[in-house]
Amino acid sequence: MMFRNTLRRGLTITLLGLALATPLTQAADPVSLTLYNGQHKEVGDAVAKAFEAKTGIHVNVRKGSSNQLASQVVEEGDRSPADVIYTEESPPLNKLGEQGLLAQTDAATLAVLPKDYVAGNGTWIGITARVRVVAFNPKLIDEKDLPKSVMEFSDPKWQGKVGFVPTSGAFQEQAVAIIKVHGMDAAEEWLTGLRAFGKTYSNNMVALKAVENGEVATVLVNNYYWFALQREKGQLDSKLHYFTGGDVGGLITVSSAAVLKSSKHPKEAQQFLAYMASEEGQRVITQTTAEYPLHKGMESDRGLKPFSELEAPKVTPADLGNAEEALDLERDVGLN
């Protein structure tokens, strides 16, 4: 009898100890987001790190090209591990939006951005903007001798004097803008002329360095590459020329982001998107790359030409669609 009582007391004490040692409710696993980053690596890494420091939410960054990651999302469908996709340009997100793979952006996030730089249906947002420019070497050409329109670069007189990057998403966006403004025939003539008389480069920084080193007089690039090279080297020999009067040479394009409809953590994914659009997030991004913040009322502190002074064509990122027509046209003329 005494043995049974002792055993009973021992079991009671043991069970009580286990109960006290076990939490009443199991703590939920910490949320970890996956970002598919088609933007430049240092940009995606910087904003992910800043968001994690602010919120404690870890962001796993997977780097790839914008088009590659968009195609991966299509292939993965509902099984995609990605929560947010961040692209260097808008056409890949227009493509995903057309296929119904993007979630609606929270209204509060849309409200802090100009409506011209978000999807018409609110499924993606522009994060930062950049402008197409001509980088030129004053030792090889005077600025006054540059063409009034980017369309003139298809003329034989520019043979060997203009460089471009046909595989660049921004170049393809510029080709779409030409289709929208001048028509398909004009765009084909422009691309054909560039192929015949221009110099092609593998990427924008290689092209810019060719101008800087005096290998070619001019190249068509985004403005921020010049500022990146300036940060790396200091004083540059090359300069930037901005087209005016709404010429397609001064097209404004945007890096963009969206939450995937298949996200397993939609609340936290929307929180990350909101951070990217916030003043704090925009500051992190624009300190890493010389692009224009799109948060209403913000200005760049990188010495860029004021955004309000850019004379861009009336072609919005939404107007550019998925850029398939430009890719098809490039293939037709032998550029891609």
Feature names for model-found ranges:
Residues G38-E42, G64, Q68, S80-V216, ...:
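Extracytoplasmic ligand-binding site segments that recognize negatively charged/polar headgroups
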Residues M1-T6:
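N-terminal secretory signal peptides that target proteins for export/translocation
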Residues T22-A28:
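Sec/Tat signal peptide C-region and signal peptidase I cleavage site
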Residues P91-K95, A217-S238:
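A ligand-binding cleft/hinge motif common to bilobed small-molecule-binding domains
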Residues G10-T22:
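Bacterial N-terminal signal peptides
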Residues R302-N336:
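Extracellular/periplasmic bilobal clamshell ligand-binding domains
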Residues A28-N94, N336:
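Early extracytoplasmic/lumenal segment of secretory-pathway proteins
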